């Protein structure tokens, strides 16, 4: 069974339609559909298994969504909460409109007195300075004042006042002619007294209490925000503070990590992680061939060798490859070029990697492993194991077609290619000048020439 996401074989599968992850629990299939929304991915009924790695990624994805939703709610609460008391205050103003009508009615008598000043206001109209008063009866009066203007507007749809402007700065108004301003000074003074009276009555005790409650609410909200912020900062630097307290006398920051599996101690977490992975980590074991790999990327690449999708085809022969660099290396065999030469023994190679590995043969310092039979030295344990098969005669690799056995894997693969496409195993670069024999490697060609047993053409 293969994972429905990474398409690799699953050793301990989970059913995405029945198993859940996260808290609160959610079906794995729902998370898969949520992650792949907007893509061409189709979740079929057959693809019902998922591997452990992909399941852990979906669990982290689900957890991040829950954290994001929680943080969004807290942010929106901080944004909207300070205005809730203000909206409540505006609502209370509307409830007190009837009480204000009684207060504003006191101003109506002054409106009638202002009507008698019609001639004086017409003179003010000529100099272009006006103040508009709209009364309940719809009478429009124009009065000039130097410091305060009281404006009352009556709605055409409702029979109540929406707002009363108590103070209006008129510094930007047109300056009234001093000779004509004194004519309306008395009327403006009366309007100012009424406005001041309304202002005092407007500020009721419960309004003062609401204002105090609003200030208290803002302070309480900010205190909650400060607590969250302090908690986050404390969570981040808690470890550092503990270490600083422990080393306060010395003034230095040190870490002492004890490995639970061995007596080793480390001064940094990075060094501890490297030690654990190199010495105590069992590695990633392939469930098909049993091979152990230390890195996860190497393990994924190894799994692709078992079930490869060979999408890169050779234009010369029927060979296909799962990776592009392997096709590039294969094409070098068709060209017959050997651009890389060893500067010690002058041996030439098709690939640079082959030359690099060959140079290690000449480097005696890297040969730390020695064969106990013939004294052959090598730098890797795998190479020593392959060499030991030449002494033991062990041939663990069998051809699946003819059951012929080989001591090395690459020999078996080369033999198997002959079954699949005879004559196209590899490009035979070495041709005998005396006969029709061709050879893949130079060693076989040299042995053929030295024997001199070929038939002339």
From Swiss-Prot:
Signal peptide: none annotated. GO terms for biological process: chromatin organization; regulation of DNA-templated transcription; regulation of transcription by RNA polymerase II. The keyword Zinc applies. PROSITE patterns: ZINC_FINGER_C2H2_1, ZINC_FINGER_C2H2_2. It is found in: Nucleus; Chromosome. A zinc finger (C2H2-type) spans 257-280, 284-306, 312-334, 340-362, 369-391, 397-419, 430-448. Keywords: Chromatin regulator, Chromosome, DNA-binding, Metal-binding, Nucleus, Repeat, Transcription, Transcription regulation, Zinc, Zinc-finger. It comes from the Eukaryota. Residues 3-84 form the ZAD domain. GO terms for molecular function: chromatin binding; chromatin insulator sequence binding; DNA binding; identical protein binding; sequence-specific DNA binding; zinc ion binding. The keyword Transcription regulation applies. InterPro entries: Znf_C2H2_sf, Znf_C2H2_type. One of its GO terms (cellular component) is polytene chromosome. SMART domains: ZnF_C2H2 (SM00355). Interacts (via region between the ZAD domain and the first zinc finger domain) with Cp190 (via centrosomal targeting M domain); the interaction is direct. Interacts with pita. Insulator DNA-binding protein. Recruits Cp190 and cooperatively binds to chromatin promoter regions to exert transcriptional regulator and chromatin insulator functions. Chromatin insulators are regulatory elements that establish independent domains of transcriptional activity within eukaryotic genomes. Insulators are proposed to structure the chromatin fiber into independent domains of differing transcriptional potential by promoting the formation of distinct chromatin loops to form topologically associating domains (TADs). This is Zinc finger protein ZIPIC. It comes from Drosophila melanogaster (Fruit fly). The lineage of its organism: Eukaryota, Metazoa, Ecdysozoa, Arthropoda, Hexapoda. The gene is ZIPIC.
């Amino acid at each position: 069974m293969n994972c429905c996401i990474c398409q690799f074989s699953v050793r301990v599968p989970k059913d995405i339609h029945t198993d859940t992850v996260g808290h609160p629990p959610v079906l794995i299939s729902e998370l898969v559909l949520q992650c792949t929304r907007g893509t061409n991915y189709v979740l079929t009924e057959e693809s019902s298994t998922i591997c452990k790695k992909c399941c852990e990624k979906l669990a982290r994805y689900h957890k991040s969504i829950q954290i994001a939703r929680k943080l969004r709610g807290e942010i929106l609460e901080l944004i909207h909460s300070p205005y809730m008391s203000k909206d409540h205050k505006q609502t209370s103003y509307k409830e007190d409109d009837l009480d204000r009508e009684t207060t504003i009615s006191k101003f109506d008598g002054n409106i009638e007195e202002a009507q008698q000043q019609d001639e004086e206001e017409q003179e003010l109209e000529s100099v272009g300075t006006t103040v508009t008063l709209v009364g309940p009866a719809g009478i429009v009066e124009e009065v000039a004042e130097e410091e305060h203007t009281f404006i009352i507007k009556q709605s055409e749809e409702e029979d109540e006042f929406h707002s009363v402007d108590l103070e209006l700065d008129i510094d930007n108004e047109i300056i009234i002619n001093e000779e004509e301003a004194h004519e309306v000074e008395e009327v403006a003074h009366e309007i100012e007294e009424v406005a001041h009276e309304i202002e005092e009555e407007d500020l009721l005790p419960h309004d003062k209490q609401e204002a105090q409650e609003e200030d208290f609410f803002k302070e309480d909200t900010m205190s909650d925000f400060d607590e969250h912020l302090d908690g986050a900062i404390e969570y981040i630097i808690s470890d550092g503070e503990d270490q600083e307290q422990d080393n306060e006398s010395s003034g230095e920051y040190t870490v002492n990590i004890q490995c639970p599996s061995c007596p080793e101690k480390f001064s940094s977490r990075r060094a501890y992680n490297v030690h654990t992975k190199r010495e105590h980590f069992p590695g990633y074991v392939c469930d098909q061939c049993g091979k152990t790999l230390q890195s996860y990327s190497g393990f994924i690449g190894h799994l692709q060798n078992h079930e490869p999708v060979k999408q890169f085809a050779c234009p010369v022969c029927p060979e296909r490859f799962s990776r592009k660099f392997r096709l590039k290396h294969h094409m070098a065999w068709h060209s017959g070029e050997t651009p890389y030469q060893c500067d010690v023994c002058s041996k030439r190679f098709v690939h640079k990697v082959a030359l690099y590995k060959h140079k290690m043969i000449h480097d005696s310092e890297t040969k730390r492993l020695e064969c106990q039979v013939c004294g052959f030295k090598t730098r890797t344990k795998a190479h020593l194991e392959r060499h030991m098969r030449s002494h033991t005669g062990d041939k663990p690799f069998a051809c699946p077609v003819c059951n012929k056995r080989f001591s090395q894997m690459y020999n078996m693969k080369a033999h198997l290619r002959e079954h699949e496409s005879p004559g196209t195993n590899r490009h035979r670069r070495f041709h005998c000048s005396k006969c029709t024999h061709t050879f893949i490697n130079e060693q076989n060609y040299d042995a053929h020439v030295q024997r001199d047993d070929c038939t002339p053409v």
